[in-house]
Structure formats: structure tokens, C-alpha cells
Amino acid sequence: MYYPTGSLKSTLCIEGNRLLYDYAKVKNISCKKIGKYIIASKEDELEKLNKLYNQGLSSGVSLEMITKEKIQNLFPDLVLAGAIYSPESGIIDVPELVTALEGDIQHNKGVISLNTTFISATKSQNNFKITCNDGNEFEINSKILINSSGLNSEINTRKIFSLDNKYNLPINLAKGHYFKYSGKHPFNNLIYPLSNEFSQGIHAGFDLSGQLRFGPDINWVSNLDFSFDESVKDNFIDSIQQYWPDMNPDKLQPDYVGIRPKIQNPNEKMRDFSILDSKIHGVEGLINLQGIESPGVTSSLAIGKFVAKLLQK
């Protein structure tokens, strides 16, 4: 619902949500459909909330607009002016998901090479010569090359010598902190404050053990620094207490840091996933993916299907 109707982020997130639930059922991956509330804590946010609701409906998302009276009955401890309820939202055990996908690759005779550096790729006639190093340098010859390397996608795109550098999008690193909360709380669902142009804001979420955590914030950094800056705690407190005034700051403890590979600049609005094939860049057999950040996990299986279709054309 956050993304323009027809964008890759919108279409692949909606399809990916359904595919993930189906895949989790088949593979016995832990997940829960717990629903999500997108909240307005002030009356002057209701117009923006209504626009988000209408955009979600136009994209085919199942949503319910919740009145102030109803949302206050549901969450009497929160300061809320209105909300949107998304019943299909949920949580999934990402390590279990990755393990299942790893098993599928190996079952289909694929090879996963860990701790391996991508050195370069050159196109010769119909094949890519891909040079790698896992302690020893080796080559792979393939008709297809898919670059889906996240935080390193800009660096690795530069190493694909057949590709014009104008198709290489600069990656901007958006660092996000998460705090866990150890006290009592009023939440049984995901709670997302209204997003701004740059991120979805500091939301309340859970893991499958029921641990409540808040995050992420957004801090633009120049390198892959995963250290936790505890000075951001005051910003978290201010943000959370706008809708949960009784939150106890002493129960808010550092949890972890993540970094998102954004292709938007710090002062730019959200940008769509970049998934480029030969019709755009002219290199047959190459699919180049950049800016696969949120909602990347939800979209992941749909992205895989989308890339497979591009290769079949």
C-alpha cells in the first residue's frame, strides 16, 4: 500500500506475500498472520491516512479503515486518531526461510559457494566468463548471470565489464537501529506509524517468540558500520511515546542494526526496485538487481518468479 500502484514494489510485495504463506506451509516454516495497523496519532494525519488507504485499495490490497472510536477501544493505552488494518500482514522466521531455499537450490543440483569473492565477468559470444576466488581463483562459464548482491550490488555491477556503467545505480547505505522492549505492552499486532517519504518509520514488531522490538530508524552512512549507536535512543523514545505515552524508556534496550541498500538519495522520495534485463541494458543473459530493500523479504519469491520470466522472454 505504501508504493505507487503498478510499481514493482507494489505488485511484487502483494504477490510475494501470498507466495510466502504458501511456501511456508509447504516447507513447514514458522510464520504467523498477525495483522498490521497503520496508525495516525494526530487528527491532522487523517488525510494522509485516507490517501494511503485509497492507494492500497487501488493496488488490490485487502484493507479496512478503522474509526477513532473503534481503534481506541482496541488500544485504550494508545493515542490514536484513526488506523488502517491490514489483515494479511504477518511475520516469518527468516533463517528458516533461507535454509529452505538453500535446500531447494541443492536439491535441484545447484552449488552454493560461501565466502567467495566475485572478481569479474566478461561476455564472450553467448557465454559469461565469471571469475571468482574462494581462496583459490576459479572460473564459471554460463549463459546467464544474475547480480542480486544487495549492499555490494554497485561494486559488483562495476565488475561486469560488458555492462555500460550508466546502468549501475549508486547504492546509498541507510543504517537502521532496532531496540527490544522487555516490559508489559498493549500490542498483539504489528503497529506502523504513518511513513514519510524516506522510510516506513519506527514501528512495533515481533519475532516468533513474541519479543517486541521497535525500529528501524534511518541514518545515512558512508560505510558498512554495524555498530550500535545508543545515542539514538532519545529519538526512539520521542517517536514511540507519540502514540504510546506510557512506554517505559528503562525497558527499551539495544537489539541490533541493519543496513538497507537504497538507490534513492537522502533527500529523495522512495524509489522502486531496479531489475534490469537485456531489453534495457543490451547484455543478453544478464539480469541486474539493485535497491532491493524493503519490502524485499516479502517480495523475495515474487522477485524470483519475475526474474525467471524475464529470462524466458
Task: Explain the meaning of each model-derived region.
Residues 84-144, 301:
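Helical element adjacent to the flavin cofactor pocket in flavoenzyme catalytic cores
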Residues 29-31, 139, 148-281:
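Active-site substrate-recognition segment that forms the wall
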Residues 270-313:
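C-terminal lid/capping helical subdomain adjacent to the catalytic/cofactor pocket in oxidative enzymes
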Residues 1-70, 201:
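Dinucleotide-binding Rossmann-like beta1-alpha1 core, especially the glycine-rich loop
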Residues 44-48, 74-81, 122-129, 264-270, ...:
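A short, glycine/Asx- and small/polar-enriched loop/turn
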Residues 4-15, 39-48, 84-103, 227-232, ...:
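Short beta-strand to alpha-helix junction loop
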Residues 33, 67-68, 114-116, 254-256:
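Short loop/edge segments at beta-strand edges and connector loops
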